[in-house]
Amino acid sequence: LFFPSPQVLFGKTLGVQSGSSGAQDIDRYPKLLKQRIKKHTPVLYDTFNNAFIDLKADRIQGLLIDSVYANYYLQHLPNPGDYRVIKSGMPNEYFAVGIKKGNQEVKQKIDQGIEHLRKTGELQRINQKWFGK
């Protein structure tokens, strides 16, 4: 799902979801990604579900996908052991909760809720259930 180094991309068919950060990275790092994959063009998918179907059917050899999504999808596949997540060395992405600027009351409640989940171990259980880590 992720490639350990750019060298293993040579001639491989790589899938990516349209509009995703992975699709942006293909264009952002052409020497690292685009110039190495088959026909210098990834196979674009409207959903990761469709990409996983092609990955399972060997129509693509890899899928450029954020590890959060990869782990989530793998947890919900019938045979997750058929796949392997490999860190690519691409920059990490961070996720956030968006709220209206200046709304400190909502921010405080969200922060308190997340902290409560962390302290009670529930956040770790959620991560394990949905993302396998």
Protein language model features and the residues they cover:
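Proline/Glycine/Serine-rich low-complexity intrinsically disordered segments
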Residues: L1-K133
